[in-house]
Curated annotation (Swiss-Prot):
Catalytic reaction list: L-seryl-[protein] + ATP = O-phospho-L-seryl-[protein] + ADP + H(+); L-threonyl-[protein] + ATP = O-phospho-L-threonyl-[protein] + ADP + H(+)
Keyword Transferase: yes
Secretion signal, residue range per the UniProt entry: none
The name this protein goes by in its record: Protein kinase 0.7
Function as written in the Swiss-Prot or TrEMBL entry: Serine/threonine kinase that modulates host metabolism to favor virus replication cycle. Participates together with gene 2 protein (gp2) in the host transcription shutoff. Phosphorylates host RNA polymerase subunit RpoC and to a lesser extent subunit RpoB. This modification seems to increase rho-dependent transcription termination, which may help to switch from host to viral RNA polymerase transcription during phage development. Phosphorylates host components of the RNA degradosome rne and RhlB, leading to stabilization of mRNAs synthesized by T7 RNA polymerase.
Swiss-Prot/TrEMBL GO biological process terms: symbiont-mediated suppression of host gene expression
InterPro entries linked to this entry: Protein_kinase_T7-type
The protein's Enzyme Commission number: 2.7.11.1
Lineage: Viruses, Duplodnaviria, Heunggongvirae, Uroviricota, Caudoviricetes
Length: 359
């Protein structure tokens, strides 16, 4: 689209008779959309991870819109607002991403027209490379120079961004504005991010606040699941809510299964530790019994052989052979005691005591 086409379109709009002045809005929108579609190739050149200032076509589009008489009032990450002398007291907002959270908020505004804080939406359309919204012309928020602007900006930021309830005691129009902020928070919670800074609230000439764009953009290529039709938006929000419930249920199931598996793992480990402890105690008891038995065998062998002979054998024999010898001597000693008990004879210990105490 060149400057000649633009000027011809402007001349055609200016030439409209008084009875057809209501067509100006639609013709200006068509002209602006045609310039956007021409520069962005119907949105194909729009990079979703870049701000407008970093788009290759942005500078050229600014020049074309300025040549057509459009005045850019400001721009966000994916949208810009324009005014035109042929459309007084109105602003055309252009969203360069056909379906995003801004379009969803526009549909929300259409659903709740007339509520305090909700801007008036006179027209909304989706095009090949963008969407357009016609709104009232509003003033920027002078947060630090106007007490009323500061108050309403704080209320909107506290409720929408932080879900605060410190303003619940407000009544009258302010109370209705608080309820609108809560409604926005409830409607978009979980499906969009909130970005309620002072640039997203504007004021009329009478300092009436209007929340213009409290939800932030998405970088998904398909533009997200938002629509500019209210009924479709409600269905999509309900679907998102259902999907959120499903995701929460799946997450609960995963956590439950994780806890069950953790309990099974702890139970297996507890049983294994208990079995290992019992085995260790059995092995320790067997080792202690064997050690005491070896000591008893040694004492019996010393009594039978004498301490000197036992020591000489210990020196001249391998340790295994010496231990086996002491076991055989102790076994013979015990068997002899059993035979003595069976035959009513004196025990070996009695013989030792007789020898020790004799005389």
């Amino acid at each position: 689209m060149n400057i000649t086409d633009i000027m011809n379109a402007i001349d055609a709009i200016k030439a409209l008779p008084i009875c057809e002045l209501d067509k100006r809005q639609g013709m200006l929108i068509d002209l602006l959309v045609e310039m956007v579609n021409s520069e962005t190739c119907d949105g194909e050149l729009t990079e979703l991870n870049q701000a407008l200032e970093h788009q290759d076509w942005w500078t050229t589009l600014k020049c074309l819109t300025a040549d057509a008489g459009f005045k850019m009032l400001g721009n966000g990450h994916f949208s810009a607002a324009y005014s035109h002398p042929l459309l007084p007291n109105r602003v055309i907002k252009v969203g360069f991403k056909k379906e995003d959270s801004g379009a969803a908020y526009t549909a929300f505004c259409r659903m709740y027209q007339g509520r305090p804080g909700i801007p008036n939406v006179y027209d909304v359309q989706r095009h090949a490379g963008c969407y357009t919204v016609v709104l009232d012309a509003l003033k920027d928020c002078e947060r630090f120079n106007n007490d009323a602007h500061y108050k309403y900006a704080e209320i909107a930021s506290d409720i929408i961004d932080c879900n605060s309830d410190e303003h619940d005691e407000l009544t009258g129009w302010d109370g209705e504005f608080v309820e609108t902020c809560k409604l926005i928070r409830k409607f978009f919670e979980g499906i969009a991010s909130f970005d309620m800074h002072s640039g997203n609230i504007m004021f009329s000439n009478g300092d009436v606040p209007y929340i213009t764009d409290p939800v932030s953009f998405s970088q998904k290529k398909d533009g997200g699941a938002f629509s500019i039709d209210p009924e479709e938006l409600i269905k999509e929000v309900e679907e998102v809510a259902r999907q959120k419930e499903i995701d929460r249920a799946k997450a609960r199931k995963e956590r439950h299964e994780g806890r069950l598996e953790a309990r099974r793992f702890k139970r297996r480990n507890r049983k294994a530790r208990k079995a290992h402890k019992a085995k260790r105690e059995r092995m320790l008891a067997a080792w202690r019994w064997a050690e005491r038995q070896e000591r008893r065998n040694h004492e019996v062998a010393v009594d039978v052989l004498g301490r000197t002979n036992n020591a000489m054998l210990w020196v001249n024999m391998f340790s295994g052979d010496f231990k086996a010898l002491e076991e055989r001597i102790a076994l013979h000693w015990r068997n002899a005691d059993r035979m003595a008990i069976a035959n009513g004879l004196t025990l070996n210990i009695d013989k030792q005591l007789d020898a020790m105490l004799m005389g």
